[in-house]
Amino acid sequence: GAYDTPEVAVTGAAFDVRWNAIVGGSAVTDISLCGSEIGSKSKAVREPNTVVSIGARDDDVPREYFAVTNNTGQLVEVIAREIIVQDDGAETVTDKGRYCDRMPYVPAAGKGFDRGHVIADSLGGESNLYNLTPQQSALNRHGDQAFIEDQIRKAGGAQDFHAVITYPDAQADVPTQYSIAYAIDGVSQVRTFANMDPEATTGGAVVTQPGDDDYVLPGMNVTDTPEVTNTAPETAQPD
């Protein structure tokens, strides 16, 4: 079902299974918890077991970006069939490229943790609480998260974007791990990394380049596993 989140992000046939379960198997809502609408200090909370549209669509851009919460309201999954990069000449954004003029309050953000977008403004994601988690500042600005955003932006977009966010327990605000899959020019990869300063990690991110049949989800009879290699995080300039 829509709330049966896998342990890591998926690609290929497994992505299609997740997309259909999330988009076709549940009611998608438009809950806007952007800072410009609720205030940057309003301690709004996410609804549990909810699928929310988080793509910027005010200028009729057909973005289909969806966030999924679990039964305690943690943001655990984000999925998009196509990432449509922001066009600041045609879309309504601030002079900093934001769709919302203020960021919302994010529990546990601050003290070394940014209010980190799962899908950045530059990639068409809103500053919605359903698109934000407390992310270690260096990771968000210079680590794998920044690298992914920069790579997709320079490529002019991506397909089959899937993020899975892991927490130490069902009540925690701060994630322990992100796993993000996406395809550029037909080549898929999954980057899985801890929510910590990349300079403090020893092995770097785990990166896979899977094929279509690398994951097992309900309804699939697949047993292959992807080849995994350890690579040091690459750096990029922040948004």
Describe the function of each predicted region.
Residues 45-46:
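N-terminal leader or domain-start segments enriched in small/polar residues
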Residues 30, 37-38, 49-239:
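Domain-level detector of nuclease and nuclease-like folds
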Residues 1-42:
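Compositionally biased, low-complexity segments of secreted and virulence-associated proteins
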